[in-house]
Amino acid sequence: KSLICFLYAKYSKDDKFISHFTDQFNSEKYKDYSDGNYYNLVLSVSGLDKSISISNYLNNFINSDSPQIEARFRSSLPGVSDPETPKVVIEAILNETIRGADAPYLLAGLISHHENGKNAWEIIKLNWKDLLKVMPEWTSSRILDGLPSVYDEHIGKDIQDFIKLNPLPSAEKLMKQKFERLNANIKFKNSINSVLKKAKFV
């Protein structure tokens, strides 16, 4: 049910539906919920509202009173639609507010965000060497996990060109797999767009 609710909120952009969750987030009523799935749903749907600040999520992550709550907020960070999200999250990684071991997964999430992905990638490129320094070498390749969710041809090409020139440690095989998936997705999207342009709707 939680997944269905989130997908509905994400793709329908039903303001009334989303505000039901943002009201709970702003009032902090959700913090009293024992149902972990619903708690996570409030965080994920509220993050779709651009008026909800990433700083709110990050502060809750920093001040969480249990490992479980910390994990919930950490995993929610990349999905927050606030335009400042990429900058704030990447700064938190660089100053080690967020553990380096968790960084690749969050960077992957930032890249795959449907609205903030392009900006996230630009900031990641600018800080590439410093980001690699704060994360364990064996986890850095997980940054590539965000590539299958990229459908923009220009961003996809830029990512591939950059990573080929600035390869991740011990990630040659994974890089090839992710690039193949990325290119397949872009090709599929382009073919669908081509069909739709030629289609005649009565």
Question: Positions of the model-derived regions?
Answer:
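Long, ordered, helix-rich scaffold segments
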Residues: 1-202
